């Protein structure tokens, strides 16, 4: 491995993109157990659960669907992170094996250069609003600072809280996995206290019976709920489409495959059991208690009389936003941008570039047209299911769980693998799978497929890629050598 690392360094690759050494791969199962809790318990996910009630599903079915979703999420994270844990290589480099050295730039740019940066900015802005609430409860006069002052539509208090929250997020991004691990170790018990406590509070207010019987006003119970049950599972799993694609950014640090597999599986299942119970109890209980349907946990917390309880709850919600932003956005963006120019940029350069762009796009302005922005990001996110399908089929079926690292760490200008650096089979399959999974957003008769888009994208891409490779044969010498 040391000889390979030296060779790849001579080819111009930065330390951040090289295969990790044995001493660097020190994440144990517990590190992965705590990694994703904050990404499960965040404001958008709770709002999403409120939307599930609109479908007319029973409270029990919603909870069951959420828990089952955890199994699919864990499978995607573990299996697509298998190559990373085996070879200690980040997602940006592993993607080259599936799409080609040049071909990997397109899906990689979508993941780390567009979706991650836009979501990073939007999450920073959303978190700054919660931060504004937090400061306003302690110092009400802060909310009127600057009077009518506006900078690009942002008030002075809004600008201050946004910049502070942005700096905190960037700092976590610079620290990478080491800082994130320490952060999540502190965050996890706080999540149990806050969201577990909120669930107990809701049950004590209205009782478990009314919560289990809850339906929003004007909504009738669904008669045939089988397909809707699958729609809920797809919605929960689809949130993880981007993190699952870039799972190797975290599994590259794993002590072993078993460590990341055991840690991620147990961590996600435990997190989602708590989330399933807490989200349903909090949303249903608060809606019944306040006499109006309310699905945003921040709106619920703002109604509390206890300053300490609301302060602590909002603080933990802010911490979950930071955790989500780090794992899902800024860390993958840092690696991917570094991979765009591996001889000139490193991970921290990538983080800084992504962070600055997230400022320049003025996320508070984007939120003024949030329906269009979310549709755009949904379409990009919908492409990640097919990408996962191709990556899984390539690694497990074509390569039989082996990687030719020389195929990934080629010298600058060396595109001998695939068709001038592009795996055309992978691109063709991805295009077809994207059309089938997202076509329903524009073509009415395909709408049912779009409601289960993640499953359609992954399954179609996996099967089609495996069959085409079996029929057409291998396209590069690395495939022939390792799979032959």
What are these regions (language model features)?
Residues 1-60, 196, 205-209, 219-231, ...:
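Membrane-interface "cap" regions at the ends of multi-pass membrane proteins
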Residues 19, 23, 387-464, 471, ...:
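C-terminal membrane-solvent junction of multi-pass transporters and transport-like membrane proteins
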Residues 27-46, 161-168, 199-206, 217-280, ...:
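Hydrophobic, membrane-embedded alpha-helices of multi-pass small-molecule transporters
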Residues 41-45, 68-76, 111-123, 189-204, ...:
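Selective recognition of specific alpha-helical transmembrane segments in multi-pass small-molecule
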Residues 54-56, 81-83, 98, 106-108, ...:
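Membrane-water interface regions at transmembrane-helix termini and the short interhelical loops
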Residues 108-109, 135-175, 189-198, 228-247, ...:
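Transmembrane alpha-helical segments of multi-pass small-molecule transport proteins
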Residues 124, 128-137, 190-218, 239-240, ...:
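Hydrophobic alpha-helical segments and their helix-loop junctions in multi-pass secondary transporters
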Residues 125-128, 160-204, 264-268, 376-385:
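Membrane-interface loop-to-helix entry segments
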């Amino acid at each position: 491995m040391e000889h390979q690392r030296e060779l790849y360094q001579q080819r111009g690759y930065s330390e951040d993109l090289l295969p990790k050494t044995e001493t660097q791969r020190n994440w144990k199962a517990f590190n992965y157990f705590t990694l994703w809790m904050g990404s499960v318990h965040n404001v958008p996910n709770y709002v999403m659960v409120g939307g599930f009630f609109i479908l007319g599903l029973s409270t029990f079915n919603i909870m069951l669907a959420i828990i089952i979703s955890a199994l699919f999420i864990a499978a995607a994270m573990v299996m697509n992170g298998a190559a990373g844990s085996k070879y200690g290589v980040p997602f940006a480099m592993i993607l080259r094996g599936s799409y080609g050295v040049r071909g990997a730039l397109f899906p990689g740019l979508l993941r780390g250069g567009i979706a991650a940066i836009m979501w990073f900015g939007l999450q920073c802005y959303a978190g700054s609003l919660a931060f504004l609430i937090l400061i306003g409860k302690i110092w009400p006069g802060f909310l009127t600072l600057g009077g009518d002052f506006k900078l690009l539509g942002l008030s002075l208090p809004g600008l201050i809280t946004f910049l502070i929250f942005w700096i905190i997020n960037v700092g976590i991004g610079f620290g990478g996995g080491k800082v994130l691990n320490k952060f999540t170790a502190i965050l996890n018990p706080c999540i149990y206290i806050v969201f577990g406590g909120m669930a107990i509070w809701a049950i004590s207010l209205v009782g478990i019976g009314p919560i289990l019987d809850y339906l929003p006003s004007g909504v009738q119970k669904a008669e045939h709920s089988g397909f809707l049950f699958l729609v809920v599972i797809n919605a929960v799993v689809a949130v993880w489409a981007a993190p699952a694609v870039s799972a190797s950014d975290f599994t590259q640090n794993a002590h072993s495959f078993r460590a990341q597999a055991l840690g991620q599986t147990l961590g996600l299942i435990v997190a989602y059991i708590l989330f399933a119970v807490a989200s349903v109890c909090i949303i249903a209980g608060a809606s019944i208690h306040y006499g109006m349907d309310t699905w945003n946990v921040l709106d619920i917390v703002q109604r509390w009389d206890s300053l300490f309880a609301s302060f602590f709850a909002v603080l933990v919600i802010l911490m979950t936003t930071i955790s989500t932003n780090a794992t899902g956005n800024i860390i993958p963006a840092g690696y991917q941008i570094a991979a765009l120019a591996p001889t000139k940029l490193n991970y921290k350069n990538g983080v800084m570039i992504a962070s600055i762009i997230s400022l320049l796009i003025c996320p508070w302005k984007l939120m003024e047209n949030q329906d269009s922005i979310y549709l755009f990001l949904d379409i990009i996110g919908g492409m990640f299911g097919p990408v996962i399908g191709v990556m899984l089929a390539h690694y497990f079926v074509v390569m039989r769980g082996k990687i030719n690292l020389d195929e990934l760490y080629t010298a600058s200008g060396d595109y001998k693998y695939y068709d001038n650096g592009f795996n055309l089979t992978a691109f063709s399959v991805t295009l077809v799978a994207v059309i089938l999974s997202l076509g329903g957003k524009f073509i009415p008769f395909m709408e049912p497929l779009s409601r289960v888009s993640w499953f359609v994208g992954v399954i179609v891409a996996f099967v089609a890629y495996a069959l085409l490779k079996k029929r057409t044969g291998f396209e590069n010498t690395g495939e022939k050598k390792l799979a032959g």
